[in-house]
Amino acid sequence: MILEHVLVLSSFLFSIGIYGLITSRNMIRALMSLELMLNGVNLNFVTFSDFFDSRQLKGDIFSIFVIAIAAAEAAIGPAILSSIYRNKKSIRINQSNLLNK
């Protein structure tokens, strides 16, 4: 596979994630956009690791580390959102000021 194609794909994923994170008013949509951004970054790590130095697995190992952190975020994020919804009755970003009671 050509390096430019993979870089365009990963930048497209990252750009969709940034756009979704900036324009979303819903916290669940923001978490999904964050996952898209992390997947774009992981695709870059794996591509550069394979393309430039295929014997050393530094990019692959770092990508696995980022996937583990994304899995923890995907497990803890909805729990935090359900707690916020129980207290505030809304999961909209602009309505949930967590510093006020």
UniProtKB/Swiss-Prot annotation:
GO terms for cellular component: chloroplast thylakoid membrane; NADH dehydrogenase complex
Species of the source: Pelargonium hortorum (Common geranium)
EC number: 7.1.1.-
Alphabetical list of Gene3D superfamilies matching this protein: 1.10.287.3510
Keyword Mitochondrion (UniProt): no
Subunit structure: NDH is composed of at least 16 different subunits, 5 of which are encoded in the nucleus.
Primary location: plastid
Protein name: NAD(P)H-quinone oxidoreductase subunit 4L, chloroplastic
